[in-house]
Amino acid sequence: MNKQRRKELSKIACDLANATTKEQIEDFINDIENLKFEEEMFYDNAPENLQYSRRYMESEDSINYMDDALDYLNNALECEGDDFKNNINNAIEELRRAAI
């Protein structure tokens, strides 16, 4: 993952901690999906000499972490109260992992 996407994911993770409405969550979902798409484009179009390199494997991990975060956020849309907040917190952790 490049520096710019890492920075954007870190910002989303910080901002997500203050999310209180489902509309805000939907906006974050869209932002994460866009970043995930960009990372998938890098991953899918990596030159052969980069495939299976450390950066390539980290990209795959980041995509998986973003997928997990999106699952938690979609679950949050279905929940309220503590379950809502727990899903948000889990998504934040996954985004932090993706941004490493």
Residues covered by each model-derived region:
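Feature detects long, helix-prone N-terminal segments enriched in hydrophobes
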Residues: 1-100
